[in-house]
Amino acid sequence: MANIVIMGAGIGGMPAAYEMRDMLPKEHTVTVVSAVDYFQFVPSNPWVAVGWRTREEIVLKVGPLLERKGIKFIAKPVTTIDAAGSKLTLSVGTPDEQMLPYAYLVITTGPKLSFDEVPGA
């Protein structure tokens, strides 16, 4: 039995989790880890800005959506990746600190923008 961990519950992580769960035998575990417990459909943000949608219409709680498909969900930030040891550390330095072993890791966290590091920006 393998534990597949997907970091990120966004526009890449959610479909990746659904596809893995559909394709893999049930004895394998699929777990999604995200620092937040919701999915925001970012391409719809302009609709909120112009009043065509509300924030509540484009933000969904992730846990129930994944668990309904047999996918585990952990709403904690990943603070370290131990690639050699095949494990993640979640919430380092807090009472909720947790180690999460994996057989396979899929990183779908998206970009972290650093506009201030671009000359002239």
Model-identified regions with their sequence ranges:
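Beta1-alpha1 glycine-rich phosphate/pyrophosphate-binding loop at the start
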Residues: 2-75, 120-121
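FAD-binding core/adjacent interface of flavoenzyme oxidoreductases
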Residues: 71-121
